[in-house]
Amino acid sequence: MRLKDHVAIVTGGGGAVGGGIATCLAQEGADIVVSDINLEAAEIRANKLKEIGRRVITVRSDITVEKDCQFLIQECLKSFGKIDILVNNAGHFGKRLGLPFTNQTEEEWDDNYNINVKGPFFLCKAVSSHMMERSFGKIINISSIAAKRDPQIVPAYAAGKNALLTLTRIVAKDLAPFNINVNAICPGMIWGEFWQRLAPLVAAGDDQFDASMDPRELFEAWVNKNAPFKREQTPEDIGNLAVFLSSKEARNITGQAIHVDGGMAM
């Protein structure tokens, strides 16, 4: 097990991608703090992780609130005594999709920025002193392929995820002297709540797709058209990369944004 005796925090751990990341880390030996604003979802995931044989706790946290982020770090230290890995996975697409930037509100942009950028900033800041004292740590920020393709139908989300990549490089440079690796993962096309909402908008904006198609069918058609590998990505794909970036094999990798997108951003 590559992560035996490691302790990892995964924010947004009650969701599909966060759950996949937490599961992969646990399968490689890490004990897990599942953090989510939805405590019930976090507890469901935690129960599954306990079946693997790991020690697991749940913490409800709103990452847009700095005190919540500090509390999350404190709860992990109280339960496990250390933090080896922080995965900033919690994110937000926005309440309204498919609008050009001219039709979006200041509130929508603030909402995206608070969750997708300020939340990871708060947590990187909160965990850094502990990791610096130990001269060890792995921080992984979950961005998106939207940061590289600049999709017009999610402008605030894409801008926020791009800002997260800049934050990743800044934090990586500051923490490198303390043997702390900081990287980002850019997931591609993963079926879930986002795509269930997005599929009709994609169909409406592309004559090659039939708007009457089932959202799942439309998603598969879009993947087939846009991904060179012509296959979707999974939460486990993201989790497997998170395991590698958390391992000693990745000790010389920092400040990078790695795509898991089937070649879509080439």
Residues of each region from the PLM?
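Alpha-helical segment proximal to the catalytic Tyr-Lys
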Residues: 129, 173-174, 251
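Canonical Rossmann dinucleotide-binding motif of NAD(H)/NADP(H)-dependent dehydrogenases/reductases
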Residues: 3-33
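Short, small/polar-rich loop/turn modules that mediate ligand/substrate recognition or access, typified
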Residues: 176, 181, 253-255
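Residue(s) in the substrate-gating loop at a strand-loop-helix junction
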Residues: 144
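C-terminal substrate-recognition "lid" of short-chain dehydrogenase/reductases
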Residues: 2, 121, 132, 136, ...
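Active-site helix of classical SDR
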Residues: 124, 160, 168
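Substrate-binding pocket helix/loop in short-chain dehydrogenase/reductase
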Residues: 69, 97-101, 105-110, 223
